[in-house]
Amino acid sequence: SKRRDMTVFSGLFLGGLPPELRSATLKLTLSSVKDREPFKGWITDVRVNYTQTSPVESQEVRLDDEQSRLCAREDVCLNGGVCSVLNDQAVCDCSQTGFRGKDCSEEDNYVEGLAHLMMGDQGKSKGKEEYIATFKGSEYFCYDLSQNPIQSSSDEITLSFKTLQRNGLMLHTGKSADYVNLALKNGAVSLVINLGSGAFEALVEPVNGKFNDNAWHDVKVTRNLRQHSGIGHAMVNKLHCSVTISVDGILTTTGYTQEDYTMLGSDDFFYVGGSPSTADLPGSPVSNNFMGCLKEVVYKNNDVRLELSRLAKQGDPKMKIHGVVAFKCENVATLDPITFETPESFISLPKWNAKKTGSISFDFRTTEPNGLILFSHGKPRHQKDAKHPQMVKVDFFAIEMLDGHLYLLLDMGSGTIKIKALQKKVNDGEWYHVDFQRDGRSGTISVNTLRTPYTAPGESEILDLDDDLYLGGLPENKAGLVFPTEVWTALLNYGYVGCIRDLFIDGQSKDIRQMAEIQSTAGVKPSCSRETAKPCLSNPCKNNGVCRDGWNRYVCDCSGTGYLGRSCEREATILSYDGSMFMKIQLPVVMHTEAEDVSLRFRSQRAYGILMATTSRESADTLRLELDAGRVKLTVNLDCIRINCNSSKGPETLFAGYNLNDNEWHTVRVVRRGKSLKLMVDDQQAMTGQMAGDHTRLEFHNIETGIITERRYLSSVPSNFIGHLQSLTFNGMAYIDLCKNGDIDYCELNARFGFRNIIADPVTFKTKASYVALATLQAYTSMHLFFQFKTTSLDGLILYNSGDGNDFIVVELVKGYLHYVFDLGNGANLIKGSSNKPLNDNQWHNVMISRDTNNLHTVKIDTKITTQSTAGARNLDLKSDLYIGGVAKEMYKSLPKLVHAKEGFQGCLASVDLNGRLPDLISDALFCNGQIERGCEGPSTTCQEDSCANQGVCLQQWDGFSCDCSMTSFSGPLCNDPGTTYIFSKGGGQITYTWPPNDRPSTRADRLAIGFSTVQKEAVLVRVDSSTGLGDYLELHIHQGKIGVKFNVGTDDIAIEEINAIINDGKYHVVRFTRSGGNATLQVDNWPVIERYPAGNNDNERLAIARQRIPYRLGRVVDEWLLDKGRQLTIFNSQATIKIGGKERGHPFQGQLSGLYYNGLKVLNMAAENDANIVIEGNVRLVGEVPSSMTTESTATAMQSEMSTSVMETTTTLATSTARRGKAPTKEPIGQTTDDILVASAECPSDDEDIDPCEPSSGGLANPTRAGGGREYPGSSEVIRESSSTTGMVVGIVAAAALCILILLYAMYKYRNRDEGSYHVDESRNYISNSAQSNGAVIKEKQPNSAKSSNKNKKNKDKEYYV
């Protein structure tokens, strides 16, 4: 029966059945027992489940204790005879002992019918010799049965064994489908019997432990002919063989052979302890010979008794002994397990000579998913075929683990087979027994008891292996090794980590522990144990490495960290690429792979660029990673057409990630296994794909980064890479670090090691009239632009391309801020780049501008990002040339309205990426204009802390720098020359400057500086007065030897004084005064700045906050109200005269005055040059000549410096006022703004760089300059020019009542026609031309949609004033 378990529903009856079971209505499973006669006689030694038991109930049975008494003595029955009591006497049953006699003490050595096997009397049992032999794996007995074949229906096999090995053949006879096989299998006793039509298999295992415990165990196998009820529709009884196997007399398994074959016939050999090829024996569950001791191996049947152990020792002519056998029990060296602790460890075994047949068996145990366990290959042979390229082929054999599954790989020259040995994963930490057997083209691979057959393709039956057989991995120096593409673990550098034991090759044991010691193999431990603690619990992976528990080790995935090493402790090398750089790995031999593991980290600001590619010199094969529109694109092309595949579908592509050109580190991983592809970026979900076609082999000679140099088979060349690469690992090889450390000598590179700022192909536009024209920008559906720039200019056109209809794109600098202007057909749009400060700081800045297919526009400047979505048209249809750096002079007038530029870009551009194209701005130019040079030297001299003397302000310019000496009292290029100096003698004198009646300024902020020396205790140095009747004034004076200032701007007198500095000591002193509204500062020489804040300023702050929330259309009304408030509280109205010397005030000054500066006017210079508006009277004398700082070379700079001043200096009062509330005071920065240009009342609030129009305002500020520190502040002199003379004002007031309606209509008309006037700013001259200015109060501006003027700077000044 095939069923091993029996279900029992009744008691166990001995000797017969009770009457109730004989009822005719009761159906029994075996109905014939009802008709059997009850047993009469003795039944002794009753055991159930191996234990003695007592009956529960009996009928007509006498329980006799006499047997226990008579059989109690140990010497009643010897040699295992069974004692029973008959007629009150002890009787021995010797039938199962091989002995005879009353007490089973006489050896039964007569065998009927086989006279040659008759043996003499061996004496009594006590003197009986035991026949023992020791087998060490290569020895065995072979008894020839050819002269006396066995034909039996009942037989018995007995033997005893002692071993430490888990597997081994103990006995075998028969061949083909008629055999008996007894073996030790994984520590259990295995019996396989086949009588011609099917095998009976039994496996006896101990309850605890294994039989390979180095103790003696007795095995007995019996086979008897019995009648057995058939199962099925026939329901007939047949004669079957009952088979019983017992170990140590208590472990018994019973079953029946299949069908009705009852005879065992054998004319072959009896093998004991092994065979010449155990793996090839029919039915053999093991492939190796026995290692240990065998005792008293006996086979007997009705006709013959073969004492095989005795015959071997006595040298029977039919018994052949192979090997040197010791006929005694010796200790056999155990095959100790070993542990491969690292993927790099391995053992080299001798060449496996298994051309026709062979077998390998071993046990393994691991928790790791991947590893090469066994590998060997034959001599390389070149395969040439008209349809195939020349390639190297080898015979090979491999057993590997991939993803937890065990695979057999074999190629005998006619094609490769790859067999998954087991469907379940085998990396669960348990022991698995692997047995590989082959005979020609066919064979099996079995794991534990599950066997998988195979048949190799083609006709070749010879496995020609010529190299060593490697166990556990491969040597680091793989020169001379040929790795077939099908052996993925070899190409992926996956060494095996785990335990191996009991390695047998062709039935011969291999002491791999001893081999490891001889080879001094690192990372091999002569034991196997599994640690219970999980290694990752201690967080061994540093720098955010991802930990995985391996076999008694932790495994760190460092691919996303930028570090290398077992614990991610070593920083990985960075390579910097500038678009002309590369690293190329030229492999020593052509590689063919079917599986790849690729990982790398990159950082780039470009949306396009090649990251890594494998290339071939002979095919289009490639595995390529590149940036494509900010995403990672994987392309795999296996050149199926070239090798004549039938189902080529072209390259496979996968995309992953988004906006990866953000100048941050990103990690890319690629895993290919045959046709399966997986692409991962950072921690995002993996993208997967399946390759079409039957071809899976990738050929490559090179691994390239930065630039693809092998372009012969490329239909299109990817853009060069600009950025940084790190941790490039291809199939376990960290190539960047291998190249840097000199570990490999096949690197070629010009990329630079280390993290470096990338400035690729810089070009200098030396003048604002310089520009280049390139081919039309291709940005129809989407766009990715990138460039770097460096400049000191506030304004300039960087990029311009026009197109069909109104389509265009512009990138420009406006007041130091970047603007992106475009029109896709729905009207022009402006996006202002975000930056903390103006970008004209002579530093490199990175700019990325993109537009995706959903019309999401992104502007990124360094790390600041601005986005905006637009509706409507989605395509940018450009047609004409692309201009870089500017356009022709006559084209500025026709630029779109939102474009501010009136001149070109002066400075450097680099790393220009035009939607994936890297143009050479000079070589690729259709034409060039002006001075354009390669490289970027920048200003030959730059502003340093000590560039300008005496607290002069350094102004960086592209061709150098200049010094603003306005507030120093000195002059000259570096503010270290004396300023214009007058001496006021005894009796006093005075220099008076008078503004023209129609040009008297009103200011919110004033700046005054002068140098002097005197010994007076009382004197007036400078006084500024307003027009008659207004009463506003400002006076710089000496009182009791201390310098001070008094001023009145419409309310009360305000005074500020430096009380600590003695200034009437005859030494030269410089005094600086600033005013912003009612706030004021005063500084003498290098003494700390004195600050003064009148009460009520919080009102202005609250008004400034409220002003930002005032509706757009009400802006003008509020502006006028705020202006009126300003006239009362903060504005120095209608300034008329500047009087120097104080003669009129009764305290004439005596001493020296130098370098007077007031709101852009250098009055002493003007006096020395005989200015018509200056009157000199009294004892005043010019010292020397006018300083010659106004040379021809520096006229423009000097004028600009004299007419302008630091932006933030004018707001020192404001800044320091907030400092008293806990904010840091503001230094005087580098910057400039024109002083004497008209500015409007408080304008609509906006961002600093905003140039959007608001409600009608007055003209603009020429040459606005930003401070290096951030927000824009009021200029040195915010001037409100009087629109008419005082007489005109009187007439206007008188006529106001009569002309009220007319004035209102006129104002409305002017508001609705804001584009009547325009102005042009010339930075080098500081003047306003083409100004449509009547004799009114303000200069009108163009309407909002026209090109904007720079008056926005003045708007911000008003806003900053209120803050």
From Swiss-Prot:
PANTHER family: PIKACHURIN-LIKE PROTEIN, SP2353, ISOFORM A. Glycans are attached at residues 49, 646, 1079. The lineage of its organism: Eukaryota, Metazoa, Chordata, Craniata, Vertebrata. Neuronal cell surface protein that may be involved in cell recognition and cell adhesion. May mediate intracellular signaling. Residues 132-329, 336-528, 574-747, 761-936, 982-1180 form the Laminin G-like domain. It comes from the Eukaryota. Gene3D superfamilies: 2.60.120.200, Laminin. This is Neurexin-1. The cytoplasmic C-terminal region binds to CASK. The laminin G-like domain 1 binds to NXPH1. Specific isoforms bind to alpha-dystroglycan and to alpha-latrotoxin.
